[in-house]
C-alpha cells in the first residue's frame, strides 16, 4: 500500500518535498537529507502527517 507523504525541513519547518512510500516495508517515519531552498543547503527532512 503506497501512500503520499510530505517531507519537512527540520531547521526551518518548510514542507519542500512530496513523495510516496510503501507502509508495509517502511512503517517508521522517513528521514532524508535533501536540499532546502530557504536555507540554501542540504538539511535533514522528516516525514510529516
UniProtKB/Swiss-Prot annotation:
Family: Belongs to the bacterial ribosomal protein bL33 family.
Keyword annotations: Ribonucleoprotein, Ribosomal protein
Domain of life: Bacteria
Cellular component aspect of the GO annotation: cytoplasm; ribonucleoprotein complex; ribosome
HAMAP family: Ribosomal_bL33
Matches recorded under SUPFAM superfamilies: Zn-binding ribosomal proteins
Gene: rpmG1
One GO term of the biological process aspect: translation
Species: Bacillus cytotoxicus (strain DSM 22905 / CIP 110041 / 391-98 / NVH 391-98)
Name under which the protein is recorded: Large ribosomal subunit protein bL33A
GO molecular function terms noted in the UniProt entry: structural constituent of ribosome
Amino acid at each position: 500500500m503506497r501512500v503520499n507523504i510530505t517531507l519537512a525541513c527540520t531547521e526551518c519547518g518548510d514542507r519542500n518535498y512530496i513523495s510516496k512510500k510503501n507502509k508495509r516495508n517502511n512503517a517508521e517515519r522517513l528521514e532524508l537529507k535533501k536540499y532546502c531552498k530557504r536555507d540554501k543547503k542540504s538539511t535533514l527532512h522528516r516525514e510529516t502527517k
